[in-house]
Swiss-Prot record:
PANTHER family: DEVELOPMENTALLY REGULATED GTP-BINDING PROTEIN-RELATED (PTHR11702), MITOCHONDRIAL RIBOSOME-ASSOCIATED GTPASE 2 (PTHR11702:SF31)
Compartments where found: Cytoplasm
The protein's Enzyme Commission number: 3.6.5.-
GO cellular component, one term: cytoplasm
Positions contributing to Mg(2+) binding: S173, T193
Gene Ontology terms for molecular function: GTP binding; GTPase activity; magnesium ion binding
Name of protein: GTPase Obg
Cofactor: Mg(2+)
Amino acid sequence: MRFVDEVVIKLQAGKGGNGCVSFRREKYVPRGGPDGGDGGNGGSIYLKADENVNTLIDYRYKREYYAENGRPGEGRNCYGKAGEDLYLVVPVGTSVFDIDTNKKIGEVLQHGQTFKLVSGGKRGIGNTHFKSSTNQAPRKFTLGEEGEYKEVRLELNLLADVALLGLPNAGKSTLIRSVSEATPKVADYPFTTMYPHLGVVKVGVDSFVMADIPGVIEGAAEGAGLGLRFLKHLTRARCVLHVVDICPFNESDPVENYFAVEKELEKYSQELFDKPRFLVINKIDLLADKVEQKCQEFVEQIGYQGKYYTISAAMKKGTDELAKKLNEFLQKQE
């Protein structure tokens, strides 16, 4: 299924039903009083989060949504039926922005959570309510109100505990495949990953969610490549893994590659740059010898002071230990 993480839709809540003008007319009550009922309220439109949905693609092809109108009131004090509410099912992590103001107006972050987008119009009042001591046969009633209209932008930011960051072909997709049941495409060419993937990593009785996004290239913060569009999916992650290919097939310099990604991350968002971040040195199986020494030299060259991990995602070497350490970190954060 195609991954869509941003759409614009138009919403029209239902109109309230009109109140009714009616008088009681029975065989032995020729001049009965007013008995016009109220109309029904118009239906509202809500977002509803569903953990089984992972894309906004349904809203790419249908852009306008209408809730049901309330029915008019009837005689014998019968109220009109309320318009049925409409629920738009979206992935967990979906935010809503008002198109007119470009301000965020809400979000749904938990399975089953709802958020009202537009409110249905209020019902009209029947003539029963207008009877008084001086007006025993009122013909006054009110119309139902129009439902609220709004144009909104839905944006999906994936909810993950750990996010993978790195250049194309750094081995991020192979890593997530090796520690979870996610199945992103893996190949030896840039941008094999065209959209984000989520994988559930199980460590004993615990588990956490890992996200793989398309690789970041130089200029991503200005829109180059695919990285800019998907960097936003890192914003809700609790920590970031910077995956570096220690032995690039294109013979590029791992040190330069490391700084290129770090630079783009900082330019994109200082908040994202300040998140807990760990270095993962991948593809150590391609180093002929002195693996530990070469990895240590790389770490010293980039001036990295934090915790780092050396792995071969393809050979599943060091990946279990990495998952275990990540789980320990996440448990301490709770």
